[in-house]
């Protein structure tokens, strides 16, 4: 599992890339990815292209990111979701909270 935070050149967007299992073991690294950056982004992208697994802990971490980013006003996209990940997000009604692609 690896988590990488990539701020955009203008500092307006933060992309968080997830590689491998996105589960409880990723909690601290995921939190650090958005709390310990030198910018205050307006938009967040969680790139799940290389995520091989996602569990209920990951769903909770996404909700914590949403709270950190402003709750209902947060601009967060969950990008490059596999069909399996999309199914988990749909069952959890996350399409009402996040932009999913």
From Swiss-Prot:
Q: Does the keyword Ribonucleoprotein apply?
A: no
Q: Which UniProt keywords apply?
A: Secreted
Pfam families the UniProt entry points to: STAS_2 (PF13466)
Looking at the record's lineage, which domain of life comes first?
A: Bacteria
Q: How is it modified after translation?
A: Phosphorylated on a serine residue, possibly on Ser-56.
Indicate the segments forming the STAS domain, all copies: 14-101
Q: What is this protein called?
A: STAS-domain containing protein PA14_20770
